């Protein structure tokens, strides 16, 4: 992907501004330092100066590391490296915990959502807290 972006000129300048690039942090890379390292690697592979959205792929409820991971995400946002922060597959309990431990809500929660699985509780919770729902 990075080579294609660079070859087409879409990795910098005015062309870059016309794209929305999202990347996700793998579960095994959660944690403060490992999230920062993984992000740097993603930028290198994408050959970009920033991403439009960086997302936690899964809340890892049995080995909760999302708090430290989120703190790294906030650092990246504050530095202009990731413009929007999101999560994937977070249920209301996960979102509450993240908010209680960091004081922040994600901008987006990407969840499986379709006519046969509407996840009304998750959607309502996100709406109440100003979190956009992105369906996959």
Task: Set out the residue ranges of the language-model regions.
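Aromatic/hydrophobic pocket-lining residues that form the small-molecule binding cavity
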Residues: 1, 35, 39, 66-69
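N-terminal binding-site loop/beta-alpha segment at the start of enzyme catalytic domains
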Residues: 2-19, 49, 72
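Short loop/turn motifs at secondary-structure junctions
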Residues: 15, 47-50, 81, 104-105
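Extended hydrophobic secondary-structure segments that form protein cores and membrane-embedded regions
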Residues: 20-24, 55, 110
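Active-site mouth loops of central-metabolism enzymes
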Residues: 23-34, 61-62
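An active-site-proximal structural segment forming one wall of the substrate-binding cleft
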Residues: 31, 35-50
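Active-site groove signature of glycoside hydrolases
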Residues: 46-63
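Beta/alpha (TIM)-barrel catalytic core signal, keyed to glycine-rich beta->alpha loops juxtaposed to Asp/Glu
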Residues: 58-136
């Amino acid at each position: 992907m990075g080579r294609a972006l660079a070859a087409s000129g879409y990795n910098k300048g005015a062309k870059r501004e016309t794209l929305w690039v999202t990347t996700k942090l793998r579960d095994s890379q959660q944690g403060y330092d490992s999230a920062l390292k993984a992000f740097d690697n993603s930028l290198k592979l994408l050959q970009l100066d920033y991403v439009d959205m960086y997302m936690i792929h899964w809340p890892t409820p049995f080995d909760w590391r999302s708090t430290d991971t989120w703190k790294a995400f906030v650092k990246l946002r504050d530095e202009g490296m990731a413009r929007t922060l999101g999560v994937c597959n977070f249920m209301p309990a996960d979102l509450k915990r993240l908010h209680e431990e960091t004081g922040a809500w994600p901008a987006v929660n990407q969840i499986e959502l379709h006519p046969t699985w509407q996840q009304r509780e998750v959607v309502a919770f996100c709406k109440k807290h100003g979190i956009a729902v992105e369906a996959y």
